[in-house]
From Swiss-Prot:
It comes from Saccharomyces cerevisiae (strain ATCC 204508 / S288c). PROSITE patterns: FAD_FR, FLAVODOXIN_LIKE. Belongs to the NADPH-dependent diflavin oxidoreductase NDOR1 family. GO terms for molecular function: flavin adenine dinucleotide binding; FMN binding; NADP binding; NADPH-hemoprotein reductase activity; oxidoreductase activity; oxidoreductase activity, acting on NAD(P)H. The lineage of its organism: Eukaryota, Fungi, Dikarya, Ascomycota, Saccharomycotina. The keyword Cytoplasm applies. GO terms for cellular component: cytosol; cytosolic [4Fe-4S] assembly targeting complex; mitochondrion. FAD binds at R383, R413, Y414, Y415, S416, G445, I446, C447, T448, W623. Residues 7-168 form the Flavodoxin-like domain. It is found in: Cytoplasm; Mitochondrion. This is NADPH-dependent diflavin oxidoreductase 1. NADP(+) binds at S538, R539.
Length: 623
């Protein structure tokens, strides 16, 4: 695939949705012979912006209306990221007036700061620096309750395809022809059977070409900010009879470096696949076995996606599958877009060519069907993995050299720190993801399964992420901490940091004797006067009479808490699972402001809450 600095596709992605849609757009442009630059916003070289004429951005939002981490991720030797360059105050207001741009935001209206990520980019790039819009910014909503798909009942993919259609329509009308060998010819779409070869792919290394690396010892190169930790404690803190396994997980730096972190900061953990799953994948693609342990290198440089967390050495197919390839994830559209042409092995088909054609057609349908219902029913509903898809479609014979193009890269996972500043151990509180699907198959989260398997003394790769959630001016302000379940994790760090002498902690779980995590410590803090503790148990009425959820306790304490918020500038910190809980807490908080805060109506109460969010006095960290 050729690249050009004139047309640029950038993405900011936290969970992979924006990356996947940007990949599809890039794929479509290449098939129409539009050379372009394609990378994350953080990987884009600011110096190239003066050569850019058409800028297409797809970006999600994370945390408190923040841009995804790969927008600010600084890699290589560049002194600044593209975004940090754009934020410089001395830039002229017409800096980007040579650019025509189109933006797509992906968001979830259940979060207070819906699509703030793309709005920040739009405000700076278009409003303040003069870029021209090809068409109005599109905003997709996971809930279909706001944005461009409001009230349609359609998912975010419907907004993406509207965006793609507009982008292609513009480019094809602007450039209906292209030059080939000095001749002007009509622009036509590439034959769908042709695979788009990536700029850099794998090949057998000339060095040690006849060797096989069978040792399990590996190292990771190319990421200077990567750290190594040693596991000190990994114990279950929910009862054995409870369905949810929650771990107290402690580790320390192997070089005994004292880590510097604050309440609200997170740890980035780099997981890997199991050896059993890697063997399963190789058994499915049995033609890989012969070279699975031979040394490999790249034809043209290491892809940027592999630099975060370091590249495994020795670099073999087996090690890449274990440490970098996320083949146990649910496949996205771009996976099918790239692999359907490899359904070629008729020798495995009981019905011969007819069955092969059926498999090819179905895979292609998953790649191109815009309503995506079949893809959702086949992959998302049963949480079917890429490996299971390959085990279903046995005609697919994948070329190993493109493995890092069609398989997604394992993304690191982020966990809130539970320990207090200065603790030599970094402590996490981790809910192990394990459940059964409609297929009655057990599913496990790749990172929590990795953590659950770790033994004391084993090593992990990690980084620290400073989020600066709790501001210095909040020191000694009253704090209301609300955290059901493992939402308690970052709140523990707040209490341990002793940044306030007036803390109310509202904790919720199902049962007092099953999943009341850190019960002894919380009650000890209560006895010593460090916190006012209010615990609710949703399935245990005997121990929680009249109070089922954290929002019930919030309402019961409404007058007292509202007084602290309105008259004493208290900070409200909400943590836990996204979905109904944060919405219900927010609605309860608004009702409290109306009843006890002297706000006459809903609008004035909401306005006050917005001001709290703006000044970071109402903090919502949900996942």
């Amino acid at each position: 695939m050729s690249s050009s600095k004139k047309i640029v596709i950038l993405y900011g992605s936290e969970t992979g949705n924006a990356h996947d849609f940007a990949t599809i757009l890039s794929h479509r442009l290449h098939r129409w012979h539009f050379s372009h630059t394609f990378c994350s916003i953080g990987d884009y070289d600011p110096q190239d912006i003066l050569k850019c004429r058409y800028l297409f951005i797809i970006c999600s939002t994370t945390g408190q209306g923040e841009l995804p981490r790969n927008v600010n991720a600084l890699k290589g030797e560049r002194p600044v990221t593209f975004w940090s360059f754009l934020k410089r105050k001395n830039l002229p207001s017409n800096l980007l007036n040579h650019i025509q741009t189109a933006m797509l935001g992906l968001g979830d209206s259940s979060y207070p700061k819906f699509n703030y990520g793309i709005r920040k980019l739009h405000q700076r790039i278009v409003t303040q620096l003069g870029a021209n819009e090809l068409f109005d910014r599109l905003e997709a909503d996971d809930q279909a309750m706001a944005g461009s798909n409001k009230g349609t009942g359609l998912g975010i993919e419907s907004v993406y395809f509207e965006y793609e259609k507009k982008v292609l329509s513009f480019l094809l009308s602007k450039y209906p022809n292209r030059k080939v060998n000095g001749q002007i010819i009509k622009r036509e779409e590439l034959d769908p059977e042709v695979y788009l070869e990536p700029a850099s792919y794998l090949q057998l290394s000339d060095e040690h070409a006849n060797e096989k690396f069978t040792s399990t010892k590996v190292i990771f190169e190319g990421d200077e900010s990567l750290k190594v930790g040693r596991v000190n404690i990994n114990k279950r803190i929910t009862s054995e009879g409870h369905f949810q396994d929650v771990r107290q997980f402690k580790f320390s730096n192997v070089d005994k470096i004292q880590e510097n972190y604050e309440p609200g900061d997170t740890v980035t953990i780099y997981p890997c696949n199991t050896d059993e799953d890697v063997s399963r994948f190789l058994a499915n693609q049995s033609h890989w076995l012969e070279i699975a342990d031979k040394p490999l290198n790249f034809t043209s440089g290491v892809p940027n996606d592999l630099k975060d967390g370091g590249l495994v050495r020795p670099m073999t197919l087996r090690n890449l599958l274990k440490y970098h390839c996320d083949f146990m994830s649910i496949p996205r559209t771009s996976f099918f877009l790239k692999i359907w042409t490899f359904a070629t092995d008729v020798t495995k088909m009981e019905r011969g060519q007819e069955q092969l054609n059926d498999q090819r057609e179905k895979l292609r349908q998953f790649a191109t069907d815009q309503d995506m219902q079949d893809l959702y029913d086949y992959c998302n509903r049963p949480r079917r993995s890429i490996l299971e898809v390959l085990e279903d479609f046995i005609s697919v014979k994948l070329p190993w050299k493109y493995v890092l193009d069609y398989l997604p890269i394992i993304k690191p996972r982020y966990y809130s720190i539970s320990s207090g500043p200065g603790d030599p151990n970094i402590e996490l509180t981790v809910a192990i993801v394990k459940y059964k699907t409609i297929l009655r198959k057990i599913r496990r989260g790749i990172c929590t399964n990795y953590i659950a398997r770790l033994q004391e003394g084993e090593q992990i790769r990690y980084k620290l992420q400073n989020n600066h959630i709790i501001k210095k001016e909040f020191l000694n302000k009253p704090m209301i901490l609300v955290g059901p379940g493992v939402g308690l994790a970052p709140l523990l760090s707040v209490v341990k940091a002793e940044i306030s002498k007036d803390i109310k902690l509202l904790f919720g779980c199902r049962y007092k004797d099953k999943d009341y995590i850190y019960k002894d410590m919380l009650e000890d803090w209560f006895r010593k006067g460090k916190i006012a503790l209010h615990s609710s148990f949703s399935r245990d009425e005997e121990n929680s009479p009249g109070v089922k959820y954290v929002q019930d306790y919030l309402w019961r304490l409404g007058e007292e808490i509202t007084n602290l918020v309105v008259n004493k500038d208290a900070v409200f910190f909400l943590c836990g699972s996204s979905g109904k809980m944060p919405i219900q807490v927010r609605l309860t908080f608004i009702e409290m402001l109306k009843k006890w805060g002297n706000f006459s109506d809903e609008e004035t109460a909401k306005k006050y809450l917005k001001e709290m969010e703006k000044s970071d006095r109402y903090i919502q960290e949900t996942w």
